[in-house]
């Protein structure tokens, strides 16, 4: 090596900012949860769909500005120039599972059944500033019906969501699906004379803060404005008090039951045909949910659900977990939302020029998994494999035969493949793997046709709880005939 040639520094072994690694239980518990949800989706006639992690920026719905890269929010790059000249395509990692569905529905519209019912689960990527609990890669779990304008599709999605939450482990009474309709608000804005476009968008952005600032805060923001907690003044939308009242009546029209809420909404929309249509759709959804056995203790009409109203075109729904947990400061708080969805028409319109109605739901995978752990339904230490220790290198085939017999019996097992010189290190390895049992057979045991079966769980419990006399009287290691190895391990594992 030349003296003036600098030695390359070693790369840092670190996870990129905003990303994380998943180990053991994180992976298996997420898979178990998603498998349970998939069973419900499949039972409802939905088909799985896997799409590429990479889409063209054009298909994702991002538009190239007058700069060298697409809009912020996606991880995007431009391919090399195509042969013969010309710029290469802009590609990006998918930022959700809905945009790829739109592309698939347009690309294969001649082959897919209509309506097309699909579910999809997988990672998505956002090129956003990371923060506590906010990552650039995360999992989504979606189910959508494309091609049906019937509110029966919306009702079915809500019923399926309830079944999926329960099958995943959330008990009935610990969740509530709340349903609203964008058309009802459209009717109210129409009757107020609020034009579509920016005025209506300003109202939508304002009522989105209802759960944070309450009725009085929204009233101020719809009219003249208000000071926030920091003392800064936030400009209001500029509606008159008379114009603001119908919006507030809409937000606060929840009654004692669905019948009461629907009656209040009918009064709130007045003579608006659009609003009346929205109320009737909610009434139909409530009737169909009741027919499917989903009562008001599981799903209700609730006009205070406003998140997403700016995106959806019809019914909107949100699943909220109602049990309490302790926050980082030890204070009680309700767990909150774990899923949301609604009707969005125009899904395929960008590709075909034709409106295609669709409705769907997205479950927050990490949030639902955190909820199951908070309830003690997941998050326990995952049991590792039975570890077959190695006492004699020359007899490795015998040890592998033991592991193979255990696996054939449906028992997770492995042979220790590290340096077998120190037996204590083998037991430390088994402990680190959270192994329930260790198998030991030296030359003496092999000659006698026996094995030692060490119950590591019982051994740890005895060591922690028993007196020395009790410990001697309850050995956690037993000797059995080699032919009885599988039966003894089964007995210990229960």
From Swiss-Prot:
It is found in: Cytoplasm. Residues 1-20 are annotated as: Disordered. One of its GO terms (molecular function) is ATP binding. Its main location: cytoplasm. GO terms for cellular component: cytoplasm. InterPro entries: aa-tRNA-synth_II, aa-tRNA-synth_II/BPL/LPL, Anticodon-bd, Anticodon-bd_dom_sf, His-tRNA-ligase, HisRS-like_core, HisRS/HisZ, HisRS_anticodon. It catalyses: tRNA(His) + L-histidine + ATP = L-histidyl-tRNA(His) + AMP + diphosphate + H(+). Its EC number is 6.1.1.21. Keywords: Aminoacyl-tRNA synthetase, ATP-binding, Cytoplasm, Ligase, Nucleotide-binding, Protein biosynthesis. It holds the Pfam family HGTP_anticodon. GO terms for biological process: histidyl-tRNA aminoacylation. SUPFAM superfamilies: Class II aaRS ABD-related, Class II aaRS and biotin synthetases. It comes from the Bacteria. Homodimer. Belongs to the class-II aminoacyl-tRNA synthetase family. HAMAP family: His_tRNA_synth. This is Histidine--tRNA ligase. The lineage of its organism: Bacteria, Pseudomonadati, Pseudomonadota, Alphaproteobacteria, Rhodobacterales.
């Amino acid at each position: 090596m030349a003296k003036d040639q600098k030695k390359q520094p070693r790369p840092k072994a670190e996870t990129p900012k905003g990303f994380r690694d998943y180990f053991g239980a994180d992976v298996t518990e997420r898979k178990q949860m998603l498998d349970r949800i998939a069973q419900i989706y499949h039972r409802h006639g939905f088909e799985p769909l896997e799409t590429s992690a990479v889409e063209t920026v054009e298909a994702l719905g991002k538009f190239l500005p007058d700069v060298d890269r697409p809009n912020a929010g996606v991880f995007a790059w431009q391919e090399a120039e195509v042969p013969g000249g010309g710029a290469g395509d802009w590609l990006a990692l998918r930022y959700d599972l809905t945009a790829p569905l739109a592309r698939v529905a347009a690309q294969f519209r001649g082959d897919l059944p209509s309506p097309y019912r699909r579910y999809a689960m997988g990672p998505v990527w956002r090129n956003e500033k990371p923060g506590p609990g906010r990552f650039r890669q995360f999992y989504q779990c979606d189910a959508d019906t494309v091609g049906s304008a019937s509110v029966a599709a919306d009702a079915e999605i809500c019923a399926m969501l309830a079944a999926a939450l329960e099958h995943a482990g959330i008990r009935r009474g610990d969740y509530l699906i709340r349903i609203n309709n964008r058309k009802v608000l459209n009717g109210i804005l129409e009757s107020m004379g609020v034009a579509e476009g920016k005025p209506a968008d300003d109202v939508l952005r304002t009522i989105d803060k209802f759960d944070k600032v309450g009725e009085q805060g929204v009233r101020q923001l719809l009219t003249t404005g208000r000071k926030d907690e920091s003392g800064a003044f936030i400009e209001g939308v500029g509606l008159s008090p008379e114009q603001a009242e119908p919006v507030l009546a809409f937000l606060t029209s929840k009654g004692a039951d669905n019948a009461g809420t629907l009656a209040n909404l009918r009064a709130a929309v007045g003579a608006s045909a659009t609003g009346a249509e929205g109320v009737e759709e909610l009434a139909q959804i409530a009737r169909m949910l009741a027919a499917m056995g989903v009562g008001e203790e599981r799903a209700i009409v609730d006009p205070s659900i406003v998140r997403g109203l700016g995106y959806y075109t019809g019914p909107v729904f949100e699943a909220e977990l109602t049990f309490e947990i302790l926050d980082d400061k030890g204070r009680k708080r309700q767990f909150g939302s774990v899923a949301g969805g609604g009707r969005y028409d125009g899904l395929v319109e960008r590709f075909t020029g034709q409106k295609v109605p669709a409705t769907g739901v997205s479950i927050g995978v990490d949030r639902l998994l955190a909820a199951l752990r908070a309830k003690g339904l997941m998050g326990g230490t995952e049991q590792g494999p039975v570890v077959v220790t190695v006492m004699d290198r020359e007899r490795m085939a015998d040890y592998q035969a033991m592991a193979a017999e255990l696996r054939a019996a449906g028992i997770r097992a492995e042979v220790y493949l590290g340096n077998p010189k120190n037996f204590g290190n083998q037991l430390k390895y088994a402990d680190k793997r959270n192994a329930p049992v260790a198998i030991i057979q030296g030359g003496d045991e092999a000659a006698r046709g026996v094995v030692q079966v060490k119950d590591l769980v019982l051994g740890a419990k005895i060591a922690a709880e028993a007196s020395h006399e009790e410990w001697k009287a309850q050995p956690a290691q037993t000797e059995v005939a080699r032919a009885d190895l599988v039966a003894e391990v089964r007995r210990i594992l229960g």
